[in-house]
Swiss-Prot record:
GO cellular component labels: cytoplasm; membrane
Catalytic residues of the enzyme: 48
Annotated EC: 4.2.1.59
Name of the protein in its database record: 3-hydroxyacyl-[acyl-carrier-protein] dehydratase FabZ
Organism: Roseiflexus sp. (strain RS-1)
Length: 143
């Protein structure tokens, strides 16, 4: 398990855009399982939506990407590099995510070669699927 401090030592994201609270499982370069405790204090709930707060789907995808970045950048040869989104395919949102939910984020890489990777991301709340799709990323030593 990785704490928030250990996550911040691997990826450059910071509040309010750091969207994972801990890593529960990690196989460097292969897969990671992360967790986001969704609270009413999240800045995006002020406008999405004031009377019915729902976590924006694009931020669920970003949380999956950050989880994947932890897995990719945990490899010794990738330390200090940056992971950039290269694309997303087939993303589907199945259920809304509300304040009070614990978002479980699992990313598994299907292939990774020469700094380009592709994987599958699945987000669940209480075992129920809320989002899934394919994520593509590129690693770079230049920020």
């Amino acid at each position: 398990m990785l704490t928030i401090q250990e996550i911040m030592a691997i990826i450059p994201h910071r509040y309010p855009f750091l969207l994972i609270d801990r890593i529960l499982e990690l196989e460097p370069g292969q897969r990671a399982v992360g967790e986001k405790l969704v609270t009413i204090g999240e800045p995006y709930f002020q406008g999405h939506f004031p009377n019915r707060p729902i976590m924006p789907g694009v931020l669920i995808v970003e949380a999956l990407a950050q989880t994947g970045a932890v897995a990719a950048l945990s490899l010794p040869e990738n330390r200090g590099k940056m992971a950039f989104f290269a694309g997303i395919d087939g993303v589907r949102f199945r259920k809304p995510v509300y304040p009070g939910d614990t978002l479980r984020l699992e990313v598994r890489f299907d292939k990774m070669r020469r700094g380009i990777g592709k994987g599958t991301g699945v987000a669940t709340v209480n075992g129920q699927l809320v989002c899934e799709g394919e994520l593509m990323f590129a690693l770079s030593s230049e920020g």
